[in-house]
Amino acid sequence: IGQKTALVTGAAGFIGSHICHRLISDGYSVVGIDNLSSGKLSNIPAGFDLRNADLRDPIVREIVVEIQPDVVLHLAAQMSVAVSAREPLLDADINVVGTLNLLEGVRAIEDKNVKFVHFSSGGTVYGEPTCLPADEAAPVHPLSPYAASKLAVETYLPIYERLCGLDHSVIRLGNVYGPRQDPHGEAGVVAIFAKAMLGKSPLKIFGDGTDERDY
């Protein structure tokens, strides 16, 4: 059995880079796609096969067909809720159209069952959860364009299963934290609080302090 190949989108980002390091240590041949709009080259190993491309570029389909991956781990996204509210067309273009571009590349591969893992939006697809903790069967009620675009991709995956037999999984991560996380973002609450504490800055908590951050 030959070496397996993994394609990771958003490979230079916080989570994507950790996945790349793990896959390499597990013996995979790894190719990454990232336009470096938020990812950093310093996050990935020297000599790593990184293709600088936007998810919406036609070349993404060519890369998928070229490398014939055994598994695609899809993390690249427009990830700001605030940006999605200001520019919902941009958000949908990147998160929905960009993902469809990637899926069409997978669909073009013949005689190979590619595993597709979509890293979705975490808890935002639930909106205001009706029960806590929310599990996979909990009702979804997106309240932002970002949440709607990520949920839209989730609904496309079973369609691609019918179209081309796509083997797919969806992962909704909540409150991920760790090394290489950007402490300046809007959602990395652990990194933001840690940076404030290290800098002896006040922690800003909105509301009455009873809000629950995770799901």
Each PLM stretch: what is its role?
Residues 1-176:
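N-terminal Rossmann-like NAD(P)+-binding domain of SDR-like oxidoreductases, especially those catalyzing
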Residues 128-132, 155-215:
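NAD(P)-dependent short-chain dehydrogenase/reductase
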